[in-house]
C-alpha cells in the first residue's frame, strides 16, 4: 500500500479538523497515511548543554518517513512549512503545502481548494520545485554542539539590554569581513523575502545559486547586504563578550557563546515543493507582498 505523509500544526483546530478529513479521503483511495505534528521539526533549548533531541538534523525525520514515501501534505502557516521542511528534506520527501494560517507565502494551495488539489495529487499531476537549504552548526573547537537544517535564514543577534555585537565573518577563501551591528542574517534565496527583507536585504529569485549576508541595524554607512555563491561555506566568529541568540527559521535556535563559532554551508538535501500550477515568483511577490503595485490609483479610462 503506498504511503503519504500528513504534517500539521496540531495547535490549530482548523488544521486538525482538515487533517482528519484529508486522512479519511486518502485512506478510502487506498493510501496508508502517516500523520505527525510539525512540532517534531522544532529544535531549540536554553543552551547548548541541554539538548531536546539527538544531535544531528536527521533526528527531525518522523518515524515512517523515508525515501519510499510518495509525498507529504503540510497543513498550517509558513512556520509549519518551515518545520515540515526540516522533517522531510533529509529523506527527499516532497511536500504539498496547504495554508491554514495568515500570509501563506510558502503555500501552494488554500483549504477551499483542497479537493481539487487532492485530485491532482492522486493523479500525479504535479511538478517538483527544489529550494536550497542550509546546514547550520554551532562548533566549539572540534566539537559540534548544535545543528539544524535551514530553509529561510539563520539570524545571530544580541539579547535585550546588551550592547552592539561585533562579528568576524569568513566566506570561503575571501578575506574576513568585520561587522558591527545588532546581529547578522545569513539567508537562502527563499529566505530573502523573510527576515532579510525586513532588514533591508534584496529579494532574490529562488533559482539563483547564491546566499545572502545581511547585517541587522549596522552602525556603519558602508555595511550593506552581500550576495555570494552558495558554494562558499560561511563561518561566523562572535567577537563580543556576551552570549548571543541564534534563531533558525523562527522554529529552531540556541545560545551562542564567545568561544563558539557558527558554520553555515549549503545542504545536500534541498526542500522539494510540489507545484500544482505555474508558480510564477513575481506574481507571488505581487500578491503576497504588494511588489510592483502602483503607489497611487491610476485614473480610469472613459
Curated annotation (Swiss-Prot):
Highest taxon of the lineage: Bacteria
Principal EC category: transferase
GO cellular component, one term: cytoplasm
Binding of NAD(+), residues: 78-79, 152-153, 182, 193-198, 217
GO BP terms, alphabetized: NAD metabolic process; NADP biosynthetic process
Subcellular location: Cytoplasm
The UniProt record lists the keyword 4Fe-4S: no
Reaction catalyzed: NAD(+) + ATP = ADP + NADP(+) + H(+)
UniProt entry keywords in alphabetical sequence: ATP-binding, Cytoplasm, Kinase, NAD, NADP, Nucleotide-binding, Transferase
Database matches in Pfam families: NAD_kinase, NAD_kinase_C
Its EC number(s): 2.7.1.23
Active site positions: 78 (proton acceptor)
Family according to the record: Belongs to the NAD kinase family.
NCBIfam families the record matches: PRK02649.1
Protein name: NAD kinase 2
Gene name as annotated: nadK2
Amino acid at each position: 500500500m503506498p504511503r503519504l505523509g500528513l504534517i500539521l500544526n496540531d495547535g490549530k483546530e482548523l488544521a486538525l479538523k482538515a487533517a482528519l478529513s484529508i486522512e479519511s479521503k486518502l485512506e478510502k483511495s487506498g493510501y496508508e497515511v502517516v500523520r505527525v505534528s510539525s512540532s517534531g521539526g522544532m529544535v531549540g533549548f536554553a543552551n547548548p548543554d541541554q539538548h531536546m533531541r539527538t544531535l544531528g538534523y536527521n533526528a527531525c525525520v518522523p518515524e515512517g518517513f523515508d525515501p519510499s514515501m510518495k509525498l507529504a501534505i503540510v497543513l498550517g502557516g509558513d512556520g509549519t512549512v518551515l518545520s515540515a521542511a526540516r522533517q522531510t528534506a533529509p529523506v527527499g520527501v516532497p511536500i504539498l503545502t496547504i495554508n491554514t494560517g495568515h500570509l501563506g507565502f510558502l503555500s501552494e494551495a488554500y483549504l477551499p481548494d483542497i479537493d481539487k488539489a487532492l485530485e491532482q495529487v492522486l493523479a500525479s499531476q504535479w511538478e517538483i520545485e527544489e529550494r536550497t537549504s542550509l546546514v547550520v552548526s554551532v562548533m566549539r573547537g572540534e566539537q559540534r554542539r548544535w545543528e539544524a537544517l535551514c530553509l529561510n535564514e539563520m539570524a545571530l543577534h544580541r539579547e535585550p539590554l546588551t550592547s552592539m555585537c561585533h562579528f568576524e565573518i569568513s566566506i570561503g577563501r575571501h578575506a574576513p569581513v568585520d561587522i558591527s551591528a545588532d546581529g547578522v542574517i545569513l539567508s537562502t534565496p527563499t529566505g530573502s523575502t523573510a527576515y532579510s527583507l525586513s532588514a533591508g536585504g534584496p529579494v532574490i529569485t529562488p533559482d539563483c545559486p547564491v546566499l545572502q549576508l545581511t547585517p541587522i541595524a549596522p552602525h556603519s554607512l558602508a555595511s550593506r547586504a552581500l550576495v555570494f555563491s552558495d558554494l562558499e561555506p560561511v563561518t561566523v566568529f562572535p567577537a563580543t563578550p556576551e552570549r548571543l541568540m541564534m534563531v533558525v527559521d523562527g522554529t529552531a535556535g540556541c545560545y551562542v557563546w564567545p568561544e563558539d563559532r557558527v558554520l553555515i554551508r549549503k545542504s545536500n538535501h534541498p526542500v522539494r515543493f510540489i507545484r500544482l500550477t505555474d508558480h510564477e515568483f513575481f506574481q507571488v511577490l505581487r500578491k503576497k507582498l504588494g511588489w510592483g503595485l502602483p503607489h497611487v490609483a491610476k485614473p480610469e479610462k472613459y
